[in-house]
């Protein structure tokens, strides 16, 4: 589970079905086997070396998420470690598992926020 609050950013590199993410904030703490939300997508840390870590991604994950679109080297991604029992709940509780696809059809700037209009590909999500 995650709070949805970004803790760090990283630079993305892809080698087939392996993502290599350079961590730009050296205080970001993780261990092999940890769940990390990469742009909101729950992935498992496979390997850590120096200031980067590796995760495996399936073809399905690349097809159904924005990670498949981020093919150029050094694209920035948001990083968030999984929620620990001792952590404060400063955001929301989210799983990081992808349930469906949508397309942003309109972005409107409000006084202190943004309003995104999303067209869902799955009618079951229309109530949201």
Language-model segments: what does each one mean?
Residues 1-128:
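Conserved loop->alpha-helix
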């Amino acid at each position: 589970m995650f709070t949805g609050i970004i803790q760090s950013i990283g630079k993305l590199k892809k080698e087939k079905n392996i993502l290599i993410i350079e961590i730009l904030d050296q205080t970001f703490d993780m261990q092999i086997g940890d769940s990390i939300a990469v742009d909101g997508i729950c992935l498992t840390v496979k390997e850590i070396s120096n200031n980067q870590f590796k995760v495996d991604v399936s073809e399905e994950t690349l097809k159904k998420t924005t990670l498949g679109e981020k093919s150029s080297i050094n694209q920035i991604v948001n990083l968030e470690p999984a929620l620990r029992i001792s952590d404060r709940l400063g955001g929301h509780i989210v799983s990081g598992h992808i349930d469906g696809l949508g397309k942003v059809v309109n972005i409107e700037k409000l006084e202190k926020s943004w309003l995104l209009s999303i067209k869902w590909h799955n009618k079951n999500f229309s109530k949201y």
